[in-house]
Amino acid sequence: AFLYKDKKESQEILTTVFDRFPILKERKNQDAATLSGGEQQMLAMGRALMSRPKLLLLDEPSMGLAPIFIKEIFSIIEEIKNQGTTVLLIEQNAKMALGIADRGYVLETGKIVLEDSGPELLNSPDIQKAYLGG
């Protein structure tokens, strides 16, 4: 874990994380294993944000989550992105991912077959038909 020597700075960062994930503040004394899947995902993101990264890597953050948590997680990811942190997102929920992406890449068997802006890929009839069920 990343440690700050300055307790004040550490507390400020923790306050920022709790502001972004208020449910974690309510559950701060609860064992992580007893949190719901969405809460565990928020905890993982909060822990990663404690180090104030310039780049945040997220691998399938919506996997196994209830729809209400998926919307919340993507809203938080978009907020993190809009505040200046670069987010590299690997996600099978292409509609949600492309909806917040500046840039998107379509991979097939490990190779990039298409790349464009998130909105362009999301609105492409070919992409809709081939990958988004449209």
Language model features by range: what are they?
Residues A48-L49:
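ABC ATPase C-loop
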Residues L56-E60:
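Catalytic Walker B motif of ABC-type/P-loop ATPase nucleotide-binding domains
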